[in-house]
Amino acid sequence: MALNLRKNHQILKIINDALIDLPAPSNISTWWNFGSLLGICLITQIITGLLLAMHYTADTNLAFSSVAHMCRDVQFGWLIRNLHANGASFFFICIYLHIGRGLYYGSYLNKETWNVGVVLLLALMATAFVGYVLPWGQMSFWGATVITNLFSAIPYIGQTLVEWAWGGFSVDNPTLTRFFALHFLLPFVIVGLTLVHLTFLHETGSNNPLGIPSDCDKIPFHPYYTIKDILGFALMLSLLVSLALFAPNLLGDPENFTPANPLVTPPHIKPEWYFLFAYAILRSIPNKLGGVLALAASILVLFLTPLLHTSKLRSMTFRPLSQILFWTLVANVLILTWVGSQPVEHPFIIIGQLASFTYFTIILVLFPLAAALENKLLKL
């Protein structure tokens, strides 16, 4: 009998075990689609990014012009740029929904998978930040100045660290050059981390909406979830293309159409929409070091969620109190996002401070308390 190449070839076997014969729970919902959507986002960003890098010049005198040249003179350059810029937004939409799914259904109890996932989020945020600097518009320049300056809040070594990151005494040509190098490198780091993420996931298998073991009822990944994923790809890519074609600048800052000028500060320096919640937390603390610590904590707090799980039930499916808290947290993050886009004045300051306080309180205090109370109420 001939060997089945798919199951015996060293490389094809790995692909087979990950994408074809992988045993998957029979009841995972559309919330489980975002992992594969993130994979498509990553592939799209790497392809469009590579094409853009072929025409980009990492020099302060030429960067802005090279991007303009791309949009005017390169075949479909405008489309490639719009897909890349808006692809970043879709990447963050997918990762936030993916994390929300993980929090709701208790997926964070796969600790290794979850921790690698948080590192992936940090890598994605770093990539997006250095990428935003490359067009060398006003918001690129001032965003880079403000965010890199935060490192100067670190006691003793802060200022040295910032000047080392800048490659000089301000954001200038060396900064742009190294940010381009980092923006090229980091997506491949993300690819590597993604493989680690999947390796850990396939050790334990996927969680499911009920949060119960599903070993007794598994189905092969192909054809069931391959077709389901392809539907997700089609929907997301059509949304991305629609945004890139009909409203390419909807999510961008008009300030970035002005070339970078160190002598003119924009009236409102703010990051892209996907960083606004963290930016609001940073701004809500009237102390530089405190703000930086809160900013870091807003993401790093995700590492603590597996340790703060007090419920006897894995998922929130049968936990109404935790559900209320979860959706309050979602609303809270949306409020933070909105506040981050507003100027620093009354009433936005106090709203931001209250929302920041609530964000940490829900995650660190109320989730564990509600879960413990639910154990009592359900006599678990």
Swiss-Prot record:
Q: Which GO terms describe its biological process?
A: mitochondrial electron transport, ubiquinol to cytochrome c
GO cellular component annotations, sorted alphabetically?
Answer: mitochondrial inner membrane; respiratory chain complex III
What is the first-listed, main subcellular location in coarse terms?
Answer: mitochondrion
Query: Which cofactor is essential here?
Result: heme b
What else does the entry mention about this protein?
Heme 1 (or BL or b562) is low-potential and absorbs at about 562 nm, and heme 2 (or BH or b566) is high-potential and absorbs at about 566 nm.
Tell me, how does this one assemble?
A: The cytochrome bc1 complex contains 11 subunits: 3 respiratory subunits (MT-CYB, CYC1 and UQCRFS1), 2 core proteins (UQCRC1 and UQCRC2) and 6 low-molecular weight proteins (UQCRH/QCR6, UQCRB/QCR7, UQCRQ/QCR8, UQCR10/QCR9, UQCR11/QCR10 and a cleavage product of UQCRFS1). This cytochrome bc1 complex then forms a dimer.
Query: What name does the UniProt record give this protein?
Result: Cytochrome b
Q: What is the lineage of its organism?
A: Eukaryota, Metazoa, Chordata, Craniata, Vertebrata
